[in-house]
C-alpha cells in the first residue's frame, strides 16, 4: 500500500516537523584536494575586516602585523574587528559587579588545576601540527617529538611530568639562539618493478638532525597548520580550520580552563554544558524574561547570528580580558595565562599543501607547494586565485602567512563566550537606565537575545543598543541573518524552542546504525543510541521498536549473521547453521552467532551477553567468555567503553556503552599499506609508545594505578613495583624461591643497564 507522506504530518504540530527540514540524512560532504585556497580566503578576509588598523613589523620574525585594536568606530553595518580596549575592560568590570568574586574564585580554581595538570593532558586531541616535521601528527606523537627535541637541546624541566614545567621549557626554547631538531627526510629512487617491468619511484624515510636559528624556530613555534573542515552539512562552501602546535596548546589549555570556570558560573553561558542541562539553563532565562514581562511589557527574542565571529575577534583583546580577570593574582600565574594570547597575536597560518596543476592534455600533474606562492609567476592561475595570491604575498614567510588579527576556529571558545555574556549582562535595567532591558544566551559564536520593553519602539531601541555595544567589542551581529519573533519561538545552537523545546530528532540520525567497531561493541552501541534517544529526544515506543528491528536487520546484514534457521545464504551461513544445529538452547546464541534477537524497548540497558547468559549452553558459555580462549580479546575492554558517535552538529561525542569481553570483541589489525609509505617511521614510534604503555599498565593495573608522584622514571617505577609484587607473592607462597631469585636478578640487570646508558 502506498503511503501519502503528507498524512504523516496531519497530527503533528508544525513546529515538530522542523526535523524534516534538516540536511542530516545521507553522507555529509567531504573536501578533497588542498585547503590552501580556503586558508588564503580566511587570511585575506581577516585582514580586510581590520584594514584600517596599524601595521607594524615583528622584530623577531620580520612578519608584517596588523593591529586593529582601538581602531575607528564603525560608520556603517559592515563587519569590523576594531574592538575598543576601554569598552571591553568596562564590560568585564560590570560582569564582575553583577557576580561578585567570580573572577577571583575562578582564578583560584585554575591555579589549582595549573599545579596539578600532567603533561599527558596534551596527548588528548587528534591532529596536531608537529613543528619538528612541519606537518600534522597524532597529538601523542607530536608531544613526544617535541619533548625529545627539547631534551636534545638541554631542556629537561618537563621530565617532572607536570604541564607547567613543560611550558617552562617552551618559554626557554624561545630564548635559545638555535635549536637542533630531528626531522624525517625522504629519499626517492627510480627502480624497475619486477612484476610489471615498469619504472616506479621508491621512497625510503630517514631521520636527520638539522639546526634552526632563533627566527626559524619562532616561526615554527607560532605556526598553526590549516586543513579543510570536513563533513559540514548545509553549506555550499568549505572553510579552513586550524591545528596549533605543541608550544601553543598547553598555554591555550590553561586559558580555557580559567574561562570554563567562569562560564560555569554564568547563567547566560551555553558552554561548557550540553544536552538537557543546556536546555534547562535556556528555559530558565526564557522563564525569567516571560514572568518579568508583565502585561504591560512586550517581549521579543532574536535568534542571533554573528558575522565571522572568529575573524573579528582579536587576541590582543583576550590579553586585555585576562589581564583584568587576573589583576589581583600572583605574577607567575598572570604570566602563564598571558602567553597564549600573545602567541596568537603573533601567529602564522600555514597555507597547507599548495595547489595541484594539471596540463590541458593531462600528461603532467605537478604540485606547487605553498612555499613557492611568494615567487611563482601568476599567469598560471585563474583570476580569483591570482587576486588571492597578490593580496597575501606581502604577508608570506616560508609558506606561512602572518596573521595577527582573528582567532582561527575553535581555539578560545570559552573565553569568547565570556566576552559575549559580558554584553548580555549589560542588559539589566540598572545598567540600561531606561525602560527596555535584555538578557539572553551565548555559546561561542551563537546567541539568542531576549528584549523586553513597554512598546515596539522600546524593543527597537534595545536591539539597536545591543547591536552597537557588540560593535564596540568586535562582535558583529548580522542584520541579514538574525531574525526576531515574539518570545516563545526561537532557535539556539540548533535547539528549537516553541513554548518549550521541540525534539529535533533528525540531528541524531547519523548516529543510528552499525558503527563498525566489532560485533560486540556495535550491538551495544546500537541499542544504547536507541535508549538514549528515548530518554532525550522524544523517540516514542513504537518508533523505537521499529528502529530496533531495523538496527538488528542492518546488523545481521553487516556481519552476515542471519538466524541459523534462515534461508539467506552468505559466506558465514554454513558455520552458523552448523552451530545452530548443535546448540540445545537456541535462544542463548548471540545475534552475531546466528541467534534470535531478545531485545525489546524494555531491556535495552542490558548487554546482550548478560541478557542471554542464563539461556546459554554450558559449552557455548565456556567458549564465548573464557579468558583462556585466545579469541577472547581482553586487551581493549573495560567495564565501560567509550564509542565516538557523530551527532549532526558539534564535535563527535563520546558515548558510554557497556562492554563484555567475548569472542566477538576483536580489534582489527592496522592496514598494511601504510608500511610502504613515508609514515612508516612514525608508525614504528607509535608502536613503541603503545608497547611501553601496555607494559606499564601490566605493572600498574588500573585498580592500583595512582599517578606516579615524584620524578621516578617509568622504568624505575616498574622495577620497584616488580620487586614489591615479587616479595608479596614469595611470602604468601604463590611463587617458588627460584622464581623470586630470578625476578630479583632481572631487576638488578635492568638497573645496571640504565646506569651504563
UniProtKB/Swiss-Prot annotation:
EC number annotated for this UniProt entry: 2.7.7.48
InterPro entries for the chain: RNA-dir_pol_NSvirus, RNA_pol_PB1_influenza
Record Gene3D superfamilies: 6.10.140.720
Pfam families xrefs: Flu_PB1
Source taxon at top rank: Viruses
UniProtKB keywords: Eukaryotic host gene expression shutoff by virus, Eukaryotic host transcription shutoff by virus, Host cytoplasm, Host gene expression shutoff by virus, Host nucleus, Host-virus interaction, Inhibition of host RNA polymerase II by virus, Nucleotide-binding, Nucleotidyltransferase, Phosphoprotein, RNA-directed RNA polymerase, Transferase, Viral RNA replication, Viral transcription
GO MF entries: nucleotide binding; RNA binding; RNA-directed RNA polymerase activity
Gene Ontology biological process terms from the UniProt entry: DNA-templated transcription; symbiont-mediated suppression of host gene expression; symbiont-mediated suppression of host mRNA transcription via inhibition of RNA polymerase II activity; viral RNA genome replication; viral transcription
Similarity section: Belongs to the influenza viruses polymerase PB1 family.
Protein name: RNA-directed RNA polymerase catalytic subunit
Lineage, broadest ranks: Viruses, Riboviria, Orthornavirae, Negarnaviricota, Polyploviricotina
Amino acid at each position: 500500500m502506498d503511503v501519502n507522506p503528507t498524512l504523516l504530518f496531519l497530527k503533528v504540530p508544525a513546529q515538530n516537523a522542523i526535523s524534516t527540514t534538516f540536511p542530516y540524512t545521507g553522507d555529509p560532504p567531504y573536501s578533497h584536494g588542498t585547503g590552501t585556497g580556503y586558508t588564503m580566503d580566511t587570511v585575506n578576509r581577516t585582514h580586510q575586516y581590520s584594514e584600517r588598523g596599524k601595521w607594524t613589523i615583528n622584530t623577531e620574525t620580520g612578519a608584517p602585523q596588523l593591529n586593529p585594536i582601538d581602531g575607528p568606530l564603525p560608520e556603517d553595518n559592515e563587519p569590523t574587528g576594531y574592538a575598543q580596549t576601554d569598552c571591553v575592560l568596562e564590560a568585564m568590570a560590570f560582569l564582575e559587579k553583577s557576580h561578585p568574586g567570580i573572577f577571583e574564585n575562578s582564578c583560584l580554581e585554575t591555579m589549582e588545576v595549573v599545579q596539578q595538570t600532567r603533561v599527558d593532558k596534551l596527548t588528548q586531541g587528534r591532529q596536531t601540527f608537529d613543528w619538528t616535521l612541519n606537518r600534522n601528527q597524532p597529538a601523542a606523537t607530536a608531544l613526544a617529538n617535541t619533548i625529545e627535541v627539547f631534551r636534545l637541546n638541554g631542556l629537561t624541566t618537563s621530565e617532572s611530568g607536570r604541564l607547567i614545567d613543560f611550558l617552562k621549557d617552551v618559554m626557554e626554547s624561545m630564548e635559545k639562539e638555535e635549536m637542533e631538531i630531528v626531522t624525517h627526510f625522504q629519499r626517492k629512487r627510480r627502480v624497475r618493478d619486477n612484476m610489471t617491468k615498469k619504472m616506479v619511484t621508491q621512497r625510503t624515510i630517514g631521520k636527520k638532525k638539522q639546526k634552526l636559528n632563533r627566527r626559524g624556530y619562532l616561526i615554527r613555534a607560532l605556526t598553526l597548520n590549516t586543513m579543510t573542515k570536513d563533513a559540514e552539512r548545509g553549506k555550499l562552501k568549505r572553510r579552513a580550520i586550524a591545528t596549533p602546535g605543541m608550544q601553543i596548546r598547553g598555554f591555550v589549555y590553561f586559558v580555557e580552563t580559567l574561562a570554563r570556570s567562569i562560564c560555569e558560573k554564568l547563567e547566560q553561558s551555553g558552554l561548557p554544558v550540553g544536552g538537557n542541562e543546556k536546555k534547562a539553563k535556556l528555559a530558565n532565562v526564557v522563564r525569567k524574561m516571560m514572568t518579568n514581562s508583565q502585561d504591560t511589557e512586550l517581549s521579543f527574542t532574536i535568534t542571533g547570528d554573528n558575522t565571522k565571529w572568529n575573524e573579528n575577534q582579536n587576541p590582543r583583546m583576550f590579553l586585555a580580558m585576562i589581564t583584568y580577570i587576573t589583576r589581583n593574582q600572583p605574577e607567575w600565574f598572570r604570566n602563564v595565562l598571558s602567553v597564549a594570547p600573545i602567541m596568537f597575536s603573533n601567529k602564522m597560518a600555514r597555507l597547507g599543501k599548495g595547489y595541484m596543476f594539471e596540463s590541458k592534455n593531462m600528461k603532467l600533474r605537478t604540485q606547487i607547494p605553498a612555499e613557492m606562492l611568494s615567487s611563482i609567476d601568476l599567469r598560471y592561475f585563474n583570476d580569483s586565485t591570482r587576486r588571492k595570491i597578490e593580496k597575501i604575498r606581502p604577508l608570506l614567510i616560508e609558506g606561512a602567512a602572518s596573521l595577527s588579527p582573528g582567532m582561527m576556529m575553535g581555539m578560545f571558545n570559552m573565553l569568547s563566550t565570556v566576552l559575549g555574556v559580558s554584553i548580555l549582562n549589560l542588559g539589566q535595567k540598572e545598567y540600561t537606565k531606561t525602560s527596555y532591558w535584555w538578557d539572553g544566551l551565548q555559546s561561542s559564536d551563537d546567541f539568542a537575545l531576549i528584549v523586553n520593553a513597554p512598546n515596539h519602539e522600546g524593543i527597537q531601541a534595545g536591539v539597536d543598543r545591543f547591536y552597537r555595544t557588540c560593535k564596540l567589542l568586535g562582535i558583529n551581529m548580522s542584520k541579514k541573518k538574525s531574525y526576531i519573533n515574539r518570545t516563545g519561538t526561537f532557535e539556539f545552537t540548533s535547539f528549537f524552542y516553541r513554548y518549550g523545546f521541540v525534539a529535533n530528532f533528525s540531528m541524531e540520525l547519523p548516529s543510528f546504525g552499525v558503527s563498525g567497531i566489532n560485533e560486540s561493541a556495535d550491538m551495544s552501541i546500537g541499542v544504547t543510541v536507541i535508549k538514549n534517544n528515548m530518554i532525550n529526544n522524544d523517540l516514542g515506543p513504537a518508533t523505537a521498536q521499529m528502529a530496533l528491528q531495523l538496527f538488528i536487520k542492518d546488523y545481521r546484514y553487516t556481519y552476515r549473521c542471519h538466524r541459523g534457521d534462515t534461508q539467506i545464504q552468505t559466506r558465514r551461513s554454513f558455520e552458523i547453521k552448523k552451530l545452530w544445529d548443535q546448540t540445545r538452547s537456541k535462544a542463548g546464541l548471540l545475534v552475531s552467532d546466528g541467534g534470535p534477537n531478545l531485545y525489546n524497548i524494555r531491556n535495552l540497558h542490558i548487554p546482550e551477553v548478560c541478557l542471554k547468559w542464563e539461556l546459554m549452553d554450558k559449552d557455548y558459555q565456556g567458549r564465548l567468555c573464557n579468558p583462556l580462549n585466545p579469541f577472547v580479546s581482553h586487551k581493549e575492554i573495560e567495564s565501560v567503553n567509550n564509542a565516538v558517535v557523530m551527532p549532526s552538529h558539534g564535535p563527535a561525542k563520546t558515548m558510554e556503552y557497556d562492554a563484555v569481553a567475548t569472542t566477538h570483541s576483536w580489534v582489527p589489525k592496522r592496514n598494511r599499506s601504510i608500511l610502504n609509505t613515508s609514515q612508516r617511521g612514525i608508525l614504528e614510534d607509535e608502536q613503541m609508545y603503545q608497547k611501553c604503555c601496555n607494559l606499564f599498565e601490566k605493572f600498574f593495573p588500573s585498580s592500583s594505578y595512582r599517578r606516579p608522584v615524584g620524578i621516578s622514571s617509568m622504568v624505575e617505577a616498574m622495577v620497584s613495583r616488580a620487586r614489591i609484587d615479587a616479595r608479596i607473592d614469595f611470602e604468601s607462597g604463590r611463587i617458588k624461591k627460584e622464581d623470586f631469585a630470578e625476578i630479583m636478578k632481572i631487576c638488578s640487570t635492568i638497573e645496571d643497564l640504565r646506569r651504563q646508558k
